[in-house]
């Protein structure tokens, strides 16, 4: 019940696991498996060890920003109205996020280091004939780049993903 309270209070963002990255994602949602992100990445940074904030402002490069970046992406996706999930499979690995985008499952990976092109789980899912996934996005510390089915984008671009809805049908009465 504590997790539900945190969600209802607007403090936390639950991201549920899906058993397969196929639309509709809701049908394969595992209600007992989820990750919990903070609704404000500033809260996460404040909870870290003393002095980390100064090290971040000083642009020290020996800090693992993975959890901060992943939290920031989760926050942006939720703010833009996406139902956010993640995928975890023993054989294929874990995808940080999966959303429905333009009627398809879109895997999203968040990478904070220089090895942003290494993503075993993402490669497995893209190569799987079972999932029919066309594209994926990797948010990283680099410039925009496209390699095959993967779009590499700077972390801040997570804020530019927009949920598109089907336009409403307008009935004309004669």
Positions of the model-derived regions?
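Structural motif
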Residues: 104-106, 135
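Conserved small/polar residues in nucleotide/adenosyl-binding loops
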Residues: 172-174
